Amino acid sequence: MNKTVLITGCSSGYGLATARHFHAQGWSVIATMRTPRDGILPRSERLRVLPLDVTRPDSIAAALDASGPIDVLVNNAGIGLAGAFEATPMAQARRVFETNTFGVMAMTQAVLPRFRAQRSGVVVNVTSSVALAPMPLVAVYTASKMAIEGFTGSLAHELQAFNVRVKLVEPGYAPTTRFAQNTELRVDELIPEAYAPFAQPIFAAFAQPALVTTESDVAEAVWRAANDESAQLRFPAGADAVALARVA
């Protein structure tokens, strides 16, 4: 039977690769993004692009009304933020949480009545390898993702009785994604002069990482998580994330 997945944050990066991967596997795909873009996904009767802003309840309701029945929700939409916490405006910290944390919770809560009623469904929450090992200069981002790690673990137990599975995909560092671009503030604005000697070698190391994650690594991990019927909760994605998971 043909299955349907709804994926958030499909305009680029992990979400775009995941939408392409599920479509290539024969699934029906509902690819959502704040501002739909033409030409980035294949034209197909099994693929629809819908507008969705996960921070707006009315947008969530409209997208789910338009989507029809779904079998899997992939909460991928997120924004990055790198810099010294001391220099991070709290308004920006709240914006990160609105998307990365409360947006995931809101999407999940909106689909649960459907999944519970049909006694099937999978929620896949995409977090980050920062949840596997603390890293400097991403304190707010880490906090937003760690919250979803705890949320997902608890929810997985809560929904077992309804045959609804909840999974985590933990991507590593992907230099080709728009992590630091998905924010209103540039990194250099968040590095005060006093932090520069500390920050410079860290950013230099990120420029030449020994191990990295690719978009296809994440798409394949999401695919495995969505189809996994075991009790496995965490699916690290990418060589660096897998290495961290071994020692976490």
What are these model-derived regions, one by one?
Residues 108, 144:
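Active-site helix of classical SDR
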Residues 86, 133-140:
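Active-site loop immediately N-terminal to the catalytic Tyr-X3-Lys motif
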